[in-house]
């Protein structure tokens, strides 16, 4: 069984049962309220364990640190998925917590726990992709299955077996997928027992699943550039479509742990008229490891997270091997950058501290990009305005900030 380290750099077998919440009438989950949902993480000294907390607040305060007194404790480095006013918390490391559904009430600005879906221990349910109001895909990283559930009732309605697509072991390690034109594109990380890509399988594999039939139509692979580990199971923005509906997938490679292989970057599945004609286009792939980060002397050793801004621009966290001092799990080796897919440039964003590999969240708040940071001297959320190039701290937190959403 793989006890994967995906969630500390990004993320992070067996029958499945499900049940409704034990309480017939849902009750508010905590006393906190507000229109901003924030998750923070307190790491133990080894960087491999700790505690995470989810809470609402109205106070974006860069002076007084947000504590966890009115927070819900969630599994360490758990995932959070939001659809409208539905909030899903997933146990991305273990699985015993399962998938918890919360409902946000805009009138009271509070969260109420609604229902729970039980998953096997160590199955690693990292993300939930809604197909419709009554159907969602729940890929399991450590089990070679994609569960199909009804997100309204939180009941299982089916499953897709993907074991046959695994390389050298029992699970192909499902990543974070995306739906385009009625098909679910599901990247497979294909990691070995050492938590790294197989040396004889340095490529990116993606399953194409018909969302009407739940059948795998085909598997496609990008083998030219040797970019591996496509997507991160807990990060929605690591896979995206451009204005032309081309799918780009972030590839972390060896997370910078292998000095002999720092290949990382992006692979592309262009828009196509038919599934049979759908393939990767290696001419649109980009290995960023040889590109100097403008404003520094470093080149990326891996890429942690990404947020597509439009017109070929991406806000991202990349790592520099030169910043690894003692423990790569807690070293401040993450650099906030602006990537241009068209010009093939990477530029450091000034004003955002270097962070560790846990706190590398990137999201949006209106026209601003929000970065979650756990720096040497500052922790919290930092905003970046792509139009002006101005960045600033908008929230001070006691723990490292690794999720943000504005209702």
Locate the predicted segments by residue:
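Repeated scaffold domains used in trafficking and secretory/extracellular systems
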Residues: 73-83, 121-129, 169-176, 228-238, ...
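Short, conserved, GDST-rich strand-edge loop motifs in beta-rich repeat architectures
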Residues: 186-203, 249-263, 316-331
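Bacterial Sec-dependent N-terminal signal peptides
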Residues: 1-38
